[in-house]
Structure formats: C-alpha cells, structure tokens
A protein has these predicted regions:
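Bacterial N-terminal signal peptides
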Residues: 7-17
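Sec/Tat signal peptide C-region and signal peptidase I cleavage site
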Residues: 20-21
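Acidic/aromatic-lined carbohydrate-recognition and catalytic surfaces
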Residues: 25-230, 234, 247-309, 444
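Loop/helix patches that line or flank the sugar-binding groove of alpha-linked glycan CAZymes
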Residues: 49-50, 253, 257-278, 284-299, ...
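C-terminal beta-strand-rich structural cap/linker in extracellular carbohydrate-active enzymes
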Residues: 567-587
Length: 587
C-alpha cells in the first residue's frame, strides 16, 4: 500500500573514569566490532518476533544472479551470510508472485507460484532452507486486498454477471449513465471505479485500474485467500506482512466520502476515507486469520501495514487486550516523518508503552514506499551523524525493528530528475508534484565495482546511485567507524542486553527540547541509558536517574558516536556533542 509521508568529545572532564579499553576505541564510534550474533536471545522465553530485527528486501533491487539486471531469489540466497552477520532475525520479501508488474508485483496473477524473473518454487524452497540454517526466518508479502486484472479469478468474474466468480470482486451499476457509483477515489488518482463494457457495470479498485479489489464480504474469497496462506506456511515461511490490510472492506451502501477541500497530486479532491478504509469488519477477518496461523508451530507471525493518525489507533489491530489479531502492526508514526524532534519522539514512544495493552510496536523508519530517512531527517551537513541517532533510536527502543535494505549503509534517495526516467506509475501520473518511489528502490550497493556489485548487466532495471564507489557494503565492512558497523554493534547489544530486550522504558529529563534521554530497565534490575542529542549544538543535560526512581551511581559507556565518551556519576550533568548518540549501562 502506498502512503507517502511528507508530512563526541563527550563529558571531557570525566574522561579519566573510562576503562582503558574504551579509551582506546577508534575515534568516531565506541563499542566492540559487529560480530555475527547469536540469534537466540539469552534466557528469553518470548516468541521470536517480540524483539526481532526484521529486514525488508525489495527483490528487484537486492541482488541479480542471472545477469538480467533484476534481482532474484538466488541473489537473496547468495547474500544470506551478510544478513546473518548483520544480525537480523527475519527477512520480509516484497512480492515475488507471478505478476504483469504494473505495480512491481503488488498486482498478482497467481498467488501460489513464483514470477519467472525471480526464479522458481525450487529456488524459493532453497532460500527458506538456507535461511533456516542461519537462524533467519522468511516472511512473505501477502497482498490480499486486490489481485491483478490478469488473475484467472478476475477474468472469470468480468466475463458474465452470472459467472460463479462474479461476486469475488466488487461490481456495481453506475448511479447515472456514464457516471461511477459514487465519489470514491483510487489511491493512485481519479475514480476508484472502472467501467467494463462486457457487462455494463463498474468494478472497484482502491489502487490501479489493473488491481481490482476482492470482495471480502464473500466467504469464498476468504476461504481461497486463507488457503493461499496455508500454501506458503506449509513451505516453511514464518509468517506474512499483510499489505493494505486496513482497506479489505468497503461500505456496502456505497456512501460518498466526505470532501475535505484542496486537491491531491493527481488533481482530485481530497476525501476523508471513512467508507473505504479501516472499517470495523476488517478486524473480524484478521482475527480469523490469526486463529488459522496459530494452528501452525513455531510462533508464525502477522505483520500489518497499518498507517494511523494516533498511537491509540494501533491498539485495535492487536485485538486490544485480547491480543488475538496482528502480533506486529507497523508503528509508522515514530519514524515515517521528517522532524528530528526529541519531544515528539518522547511522546510517541511513551504512548506506545501505555496505549497498546502491552503490545509490541514494530518501528519503521524506512521502506520501499518512503523517501529514505537519510534524506528525510538529514540536514545536508550532518546526515551521517543523524543516521546514527536514527539507528540508535530504532534499536534501543522497546520495539521490534524493521530495517529496509541499504538503510544500514546510508543509501540515499535518488529521485529521477526527468519524468522520462521514471519507472513507478505513481510518479508518471503525479509528476511533478509526486515523483514516485524509484528513488528509494535503487539497487543495493554491495561494493565499488560496476553496478555496485548488484548485477553483471550494465543495464539494471533502475540506475545504481552515483555514490556507490564510497557508500557500499564492502567499504563500510572494512571501516570500524562506518554506519554499517554502528548498526552491527547496536543489533549485537540489543540481543545481549536483557534491558534492551525486555525492559520497560523510563523517560528521563525532558527539560531540554533537543535531547531525548530514556532508560530501559529489565525486571532483573539491569538498566541501560540512551541519550540522543538531536541538535547541531552542544547540549548539557541532567540525567536524573534517581529522580526517576532508578538505582545506580556509575555509568559505563557501551556505544557512543562520536567518541571518546566517559562514564559519569549517574546524577551528574552530561555534555553531549552535536548530534551525539550515547548508550551506557547503569551500575
């Protein structure tokens, strides 16, 4: 589903308190190098997903193994060792089903096979088996709101009003000759109704014309889609990321949406989607889906694409206090913004702890639909330091964490400068107000060789970003101070620390609007302090651990950027350099 969000020289006077090993760390970053981490959290009986680091793979752009310029399944298998060494628990693979590729795989013509450009079912089975050997689980992208108009179901449905598949889609008469049934709009522009001359009726499509919506009020549709999920569960997938899950049902009375005023990128009026999005009946479907996947062993997972306006609106997607729907709705409020605002982060992280009946958020800063966080949060000067702050926030918060390929090396958004170069249909129809999503989907930058090591074909499906000779996995792997090694250290610390795995969050001094400081404290007493200076100025803050009811008198630096960083008495004032990130244990 497409929703674009636009919307250390450190404590120098106390340096002598640092252990000598920390003082000798490379300048720019502290902490031991990122080794391959065990994927089993020590002494934890929680389901695997509760503290997971999930890595989104956009398969067209990850790794090409057959020289056609498009990434594929065997390319993913080739890079599993990299993902293991990074420390991820699971990979979510964007759609790889047979598809006409109008929306690059989100228009599916066969739910139980693999698109030939990505490989075969045998390639997929090999990927799952090889990932399992590395303690990496595989999640599929389940696109359940709609199919391709080339799917056999829709071809049958469109053929006749009396066809048995007719009611598998949403068909209606126009409200007048030549007029659609109501004012509903497609997310990608213009009317959400398409006239079919074969039967003289309109079909509903929330997305592209070529993506007709399934009629989830028909029990046969639910049965067929649940069977599709079983097909992949039986092949060993660990669960699903559910695309556009808030849009499964529409108002059966077809009432017009309220008009808000103004126009969107396509020139259509802005509507309040109260009749096409987030209808209560969606939750009944998800509850039945959860009951079905719970019959499988191994803590199978449902992740939901859940864009909401307020944190409390995520709670129903867990099933409220019952926790019988999604295990991990995506919390996009924290990360899919562009304001590096400590007060805003403090409020949203606090809400996630108090308003979700104990539900575990899945924090998201990057995905295949959003301008990369490097560009959204960066100021053009301090982007590298800000990227470390974002990583620390993502990986030390009380959450499951979602990474998007390339985020860990600082890939940038490479938006086309000419409409002639755009591949994404939303960029073609919305140009220049909306330039599409090509910029965040450019090929993964593996090394400094031609095409960044992504493909041996000089004509890749999207151009490789020009900075690949210096921004790539190979270069950053060899640099202890790189963003990639910062991510590895954070993930390893997250896995080894009971406080970061299981601890509650205690927000500390809020008097400085530029600094976010919080403690994670585990039931057994371990406490980890996180302090992030979100400004270009040096900031001095009181830590205030005792005032927050936390015990401990000494701090020991675990990770810091920039370095060196000192330990300090827990209630002293601390000076943070511009855009500093500091993680410390409280003893």
């Amino acid at each position: 589903m497409y929703v674009r969000i636009v919307s250390l020289a450190f404590i120098a006077g106390l340096l002598a308190l640092l252990p000598s090993s920390a003082q000798n760390a490379p300048s720019g970053m502290m902490g031991s190098p990122g080794k391959s981490a065990s994927h089993a959290a020590p002494h934890s009986t929680d389901p695997w997903w509760k503290h997971a680091v999930i890595y989104e793979i956009y398969p067209r752009s990850f790794q090409d193994s057959n020289r056609d310029g498009v990434g594929d399944l065997n390319g993913i298998t080739r890079r599993l060792d990299y993902l293991r060494d990074l420390g991820v628990d699971a990979i979510w693979i964007a759609p790889i089903y047979p598809s006409p590729q109008v929306d690059f795989g989100y228009d599916i013509s066969d739910y139980q096979n693999i698109d030939p450009q990505y490989g075969t079912l045998a390639d997929f089975d090999r990927l799952v088996a090889q990932a399992k050997k590395r303690n990496i689980r595989v999640l599929m992208d389940a696109v359940m709101n709609h199919t391709s108009d080339k799917h056999p179901w829709f071809i049958e449905s469109e053929s006749s009003k009396t066809n048995p598949k007719r009611n598998w889609y949403v068909w209606r008469d126009g409200r007048a000759p030549g007029e659609p049934p109501n004012n509903w709009l497609s997310l990608f522009g213009h009317s959400a109704w398409q006239f079919s001359p074969r039967t003289g009726q309109y079909y509903y499509h929330y997305f592209y014309i070529q993506q007709p919506d399934l009629n989830w009020r028909n029990p046969q549709v639910e049965a067929a889609m649940f069977q599709m999920l079983r097909f992949w569960l039986d092949r060993g997938v660990a669960g699903f990321r559910l695309d556009a899950i808030t849009a499964l049902l529409e108002d059966p009375q077809l009432r017009d949406e309220p008009v808000l005023g103004g126009t969107n990128a396509q020139g259509d009026p802005n509507l309040n989607e109260i009749y096409t999005n987030d209808l209560p009946g969606n939750h009944d479907i998800i509850r039945r889906m959860r009951a079905m996947i719970d019959t499988y062993p191994g803590d199978r997972l449902l992740v939901g694409e859940t864009y909401v306006a307020h944190t409390a609106q995520l709670d129903p997607w867990y099933g409220g206090a019952r926790h019988d729907e999604l295990q991990l709705p995506m919390d996009t409020l924290v990360g899919l913004d562009k304001r590096l605002d400590a007060g805003r982060f403090r409020r949203l992280l606090s809400e996630a702890q108090t308003e979700l009946h104990g539900g575990q958020p899945l924090l998201v800063f990057d995905n295949h639909d959003q301008i990369r966080s490097w560009d959204r949060y960066g100021d053009g000067v301090h982007n590298a330091a800000i990227a470390r702050i974002i990583a620390a926030l993502l990986l030390t918060s009380r959450d499951a964490a979602l990474l998007y390929q390339g985020e860990e090396i600082g890939q940038i958004t490479a938006t086309p400068s000419r409409v002639e170069d755009v591949r994404d249909p939303i960029g073609i129809t919305g140009w220049p107000k909306e330039k599409g999503r090509d910029g965040e989907r450019t090929p993964m930058q593996w090394d400094g060789s031609a095409q960044a090591g992504f493909s041996a074909n000089p004509h890749t499906w999207l151009p490789v970003t020009a900075n690949y000779p210096t921004v790539n996995v190979a270069t950053e792997s060899a640099d202890p101070q790189s963003l990639l090694n910062w991510y590895k250290r954070l993930i390893a610390l997250r896995r080894s620390s009971a406080a970061l795995r299981d601890g509650r969050t205690v927000m500390l001094d809020a008097s400085n609007p530029h600094v976010l400081t919080y403690a994670r404290t585990a039931p057994g007493g371990e406490t980890v302090l996180v302090s992030l200076n979100m400004s270009a100025e040096r900031q001095t803050i009181p830590l205030g651990l005792a005032a927050a009811g936390l015990h401990g008198t000494q701090l020991r630096t675990l990770l810091a950027s920039p370095a060196p960083v000192t330990a300090a008495a827990a209630d002293r004032r601390v000076t943070l350099e511009p855009f500093a990130a500091w993680v410390a244990s409280v003893n």
